[in-house]
Amino acid sequence: MAQAVWSRLGRILWLACLLPWAPAGVAAGLYELNLTTDSPATTGAVVTISASLVAKDNGSLALPADAHLYRFHWIHTPLVLTGKMEKGLSSTIRVVGHVPGEFPVSVWVTAADCWMCQPVARGFVVLPITEFLVGDLVVTQNTSLPWPSSYLTKTVLKVSFLLHDPSNFLKTALFLYSWDFGDGTQMVTEDSVVYYNYSIIGTFTVKLKVVAEWEEVEPDATRAVKQKTGDFSASLKLQETLRGIQVLGPTLIQTFQKMTVTLNFLGSPPLTVCWRLKPECLPLEEGECHPVSVASTAYNLTHTFRDPGDYCFSIRAENIISKTHQYHKIQVWPSRIQPAVFAFPCATLITVMLAFIMYMTLRNATQQKDMVEVADFDFSPMSDKNPEPPSGVRCCCQMCCGPFLLETPSEYLEIVRENHGLLPPLYKSVKTYTV
């Protein structure tokens, strides 16, 4: 019985010890810390870090009315703490780094009367500390281009160096700026702002070297000159606006005739070109044609018209800076001979005519010869004593056996000529013999 009483009493005492932890335990997981810092910083400069307790559900959960119920705890080693301030549900510390590196800083919030209790919220941040100057190189131009790092040629550029020194660590320093614009131009100024005008297109890198010098009092009361440097750069892409499109091509053409149109772009590539044939010269709408990427300032279009009529080439070109439109009217006339219909018949007719001419030429060359008949009259008395055989027998013998009986080919040719005879006489001649 006594043991049961002591057991119950121990439980009551345990719960009593846990009562101070109840608010923090209930609040755990409901809040979070928002951390802000003005880093990065150079060695020796003061860095400010702030932490604010906020609700996780974007403000619908009410924050504690009494800010003294909670306490902020910081860990910032090896950074040196130079100041701390708490106001309401926020806390701010200032630290200095004397060596370069990346240093973690953590913070958490607990109940004010129990720093060993479970944290209500935690936060963590890394501070980059460098031995060089910290800043940004900013390039601006009096144009509203939507593309980053793209600028116009022959238009003034403003190049500025913005030093990042929120703690005014370098407020007494003297600065010297060495500029290199990437096109062979260099200059040295004491001003952090310069103006420059690029005359050619291309990609350039602006380089800047900054030197800061100041005097600092040493622990032994002597003055020493301190120096810090920094190197910065920015990449620039200089473009030319599309001032227009020059179209070179015919304005009158026949159907079934291939046409080539050359487009000369007055601007800097790369370009996106889109074109379409329309009955009228109207601008192209978005999605009305298929865009083509062009890496040069010239482009050739080829097209073959099949139907006569009036047409218009609607052309649109754009680069990363601007866009332009151009139009080119074409009048298409019907062709006199449709090649698709008459090409084969014409070729066949020409071939037949050539073959016929060649045949007639060869035939005339082999058959047209001049015939000369030779008459040999023998008036000697012996001519009647040896009468010739009948003409039929003679012709047959000469025609069939002449080549074999005669001694020379010339005799054979004379026989052939005699067989043809002269023109028939108008009257029949009568032989008269004298004895």
Swiss-Prot record:
Gene3D superfamilies: Immunoglobulins (2.60.40.10)
Signal peptide start-end: 1-24
A single GO cellular-component term on record: plasma membrane
Domain PKD: 147-233
Residue stretches spanning the membrane: 340-360
Extracellular-side segments: 25-339
Glycosylation sites: 34, 197, 300
Subcellular location(s) of the protein: Golgi apparatus membrane
Protein name: Transmembrane protein 130
Organism: Homo sapiens (Human)
Gene expressing this chain: TMEM130
